[in-house]
Every structure is written in structure tokens, then in C-alpha cells.
Design a protein with these regions (language model features):
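Long, compositionally biased, helix-prone stretches
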Residues: 1-2, 126
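Class I SAM-dependent methyltransferase Rossmann-like catalytic core
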Residues: 2-64
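S-adenosylmethionine/decaboxylated-SAM
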Residues: 34-36, 51, 56-168
Length: 168
């Protein structure tokens, strides 16, 4: 229904709204996007989204990723930056989340071996205060991929010193 709406055929979205799904978060999100003066780019995979982000990033700066897991996105993005910093426990989710138990998405403690990467292992609330207590290079791009709001807000708050109007 969403893709039809983006292509100009709103009949499917309107039918869903009429059938009692008007307050569904996905329907509301689609309606919000369609209400914009300019429809945003739609990406059907993360690589396409990353390519768009890279096109806007200052690639002479550092890259930061909060939530590395197996390192696939880090590996893709680091090729475009002189240095990269990754933060993760590598032990999975630090708490239960949407029915997933603590420890889901674990890489079993395995830290990826990626050229140009500096990984900081541990929970954000424990590692970020010390890491950002020292001067760090400004960010060209930051990938916040921590899954949890609590982890992401911690990362956002501590990463402030490396974020400016040029950071993607």
C-alpha cells in the first residue's frame, strides 16, 4: 500500500485507513511522508541509504558507529574515511527489547578485525564518558545503530563534542 501511495495511487492506503488502521504507526508514517512538500528518497536496503549518506559526508573526517554487531556496515563505511571508531559490547542487547531477550544480536564477544578501525568494547554508559573525556576528531558521519532508545540517547549525549553542522 505504501509503495502504491508513493507512486501516486492512494486507494490502498485510504482503504486501510477506512478499515480501522488509520492510527497504525506505519500508516501514519506513510501519511506523514506523503504530506511533505518533497517526498524523501526511499531506500530499499541499507547500502543504498549509506551511499546517500556518504555523498553528503565530509570524508576527510572520522567515522563513528554506535552498535557494530558483526561489523558489516562498519566495514562498508570505513573504506571512505581515514579512521573509524566503533562502540559495542559484542555481547548483544543489554536488556530485553520487544520480546527479544537480553543478549539477542550477540556476536559472542567476537570483535571484527577491520583495517582502520578502533573498537571500544563495553556498554555505552561505561565506555563513552572516558572515551569522549579526551579530544576526538570531528565526525564526518555517525551511524547510530544501537537498537535501544536508552543506548542511542546515551551515545547522542556523549558524542556531542564531535558533532557539528557538517556531520551526517
Amino acid at each position: 500500500a505504501g509503495l502504491h501511495a508513493f507512486a501516486g495511487d492512494r486507494s490502498h492506503i485510504e482503504a486501510l485507513a477506512h478499515d480501522g488502521f488509520a492510527d497504525d504507526p506505519i500508516i501514519r508514517s506513510i501519511e506523514w511522508i506523503l504530506s511533505r512538500n518533497e517526498t524523501p528518497q526511499i531506500h530499499f536496503n541499507r547500502w543504498s541509504m549509506f551511499d546517500t549518506a556518504l555523498a553528503h559526508a565530509n570524508q576527510s573526517r572520522a567515522f563513528y558507529e554506535f552498535g557494530v554487531w558483526m561489523g558489516d556496515s562498519f566495514r562498508y563505511l570505513i573504506d571512505h574515511f581515514p579512521q573509524g571508531y566503533g562502540f559495542d559490547t559484542f555481547e548483544g542487547l543489554p536488556e530485553e527489547w520487544h520480546g527479544l531477550p537480553r543478549g539477542s544480536y550477540t556476536s559472542f564477544g567476537e570483535v571484527p578485525n577491520i583495517l582502520g578501525a578502533e573498537f571500544v568494547v563495553g556498554e555505552f554508559r561505561d565506555t563513552l564518558p572516558e572515551f569522549f573525556a579526551h579530544e576526538r576528531p570531528m565526525a564526518g558521519l555517525i551511524n547510530f545503530d544501537a537498537d535501544l532508545y536508552s543506548s542511542t540517547i546515551t551515545a547522542l549525549n556523549h558524542a556531542r563534542p564531535v558533532i557539528d553542522s557538517s556531520t551526517v
